[in-house]
Amino acid sequence: MAAQASEDLQKLDLNGQGGAAKADAPTAGQAEAGEAEDDSDDDADEGNAAPEGGANGAAKKKKKRKSKKKKKGGAKVQSEPPRVPLSQLFAGKQYPEGEIVEYKDDNLYRTTNEEKRYLDRMNNDFLQEYRQGAEVHRQVRQYAQKTIKPGQTLTEIAEGIEESVRALTGHQGLEEGDNLKGGMGFPCGLSINHCAAHYTPNAGNKMVLQQGDVMKVDFGAHINGRIVDSAFTVAFDPVYDPLLEAVKDATNTGIREAGIDVRMSDIGAAIQEAMESYEVELNGTMHPVKCIRNLNGHNIDQHVIHGGKSVPIVKGGDQTKMEEGEVFAIETFGSTGKGYVREDMETSHYALVPNASPVPLRLSSAKNLLNVINKNFGTLPFCRRYLDRLGQDKYLLGLNNLVSSGIVQDYPPLCDIKGSYTAQYEHTIVLRPNVKEVISRGDDY
């Protein structure tokens, strides 16, 4: 999910349990194929019956008919919009790996170390779940990048992305527990211009995407709670290209620097150096691109989008190290404003607090809503539209009561100063024992 704000904005840490192959999205040829074969044609045999016997009047021989071969299903490819479940596209449910990056320096030995390679093979189920989620994300976002246009409502864009994710994972999330098996890892964020993160339309929202907007598209897909968190930025005016390029470069720098035993502070310093080497000209004025210093990347635990570790995007962060087996969302945010965000606008994102202390609830609406959240989302983030989709109504009083009781955490939109523009790029990486895998990498970014 978008960013994990640092101490002054993050009310509490959520602690939980915890590729396109080689950067290319798979082609239709990689999908499970079954060549279509035409039915056997017996016309050639029509005149082949033997003539009647001579003087002996032998009986006419019967024509031998060839048995018809059954047609095999044609090669399956993804539809537009994406609606074909991934399980139907990949033989044996083996999904493309992400970008594989060998460790460097003191960790170089891990690439060939037999023990580390053995440990890596032990993680196959874990990796296949992540790779499936990543392939869902790639196929959905690549269609979205082609079709998002000015004039669309944010609701139309968000629901289109979310419907595709649910279809490709094979989990519509309308039955109790189904969304916990797969589907949306968190709501589709569509944060525009000075708003950097955590904005998705609530019911009745009429906001329309404009030609001059800069929109961050941040959504997650999960399989069995293995959340793939990846984001990109859409802008139609090339004047914003340097801003987008700065943030993309910073994110790739963070990915390059990340690794086992690497300190978070070192990653943040490298990200800031890359980001702030850019500037963008708007209306004749040069603006330095600034890191949004109180937004961070984060580790991801099963069913928990924000784990206990943060990845800063500026220098001076803590000395915590990344560890073997961890999963991180490396995300960076750049701004033409102050480079600092505050809570603003109407809240749409929420999540159950893992291991929250029991609190007696007096409102029956709060009790009923908590039951719905537990059965349908667990600790996965959700938004008001998701409650509407489940048929819930008149739930705001109960929802606010759960927030004030510390059972549910709200995530208001995070915004820089009005008139500024912000951009975001993000990938999920897995620190495997022998290599680093950029699980969500595609040929788009």
Curated annotation (Swiss-Prot):
Binding residues for substrate: H198, H306
Major enzyme class: hydrolase
Alphabetized GO MF terms: initiator methionyl aminopeptidase activity; metal ion binding; metalloaminopeptidase activity
GO CC terms: cytoplasm
Acidic residues composition-biased segments: 34-46
Entry keywords, A to Z: Aminopeptidase, Cytoplasm, Hydrolase, Metal-binding, Protease
Family per similarity comment: Belongs to the peptidase M24A family. Methionine aminopeptidase eukaryotic type 2 subfamily.
Protein name: Methionine aminopeptidase 2-1
The species this protein was found in: Aspergillus flavus (strain ATCC 200026 / FGSC A1120 / IAM 13836 / NRRL 3357 / JCM 12722 / SRRC 167)
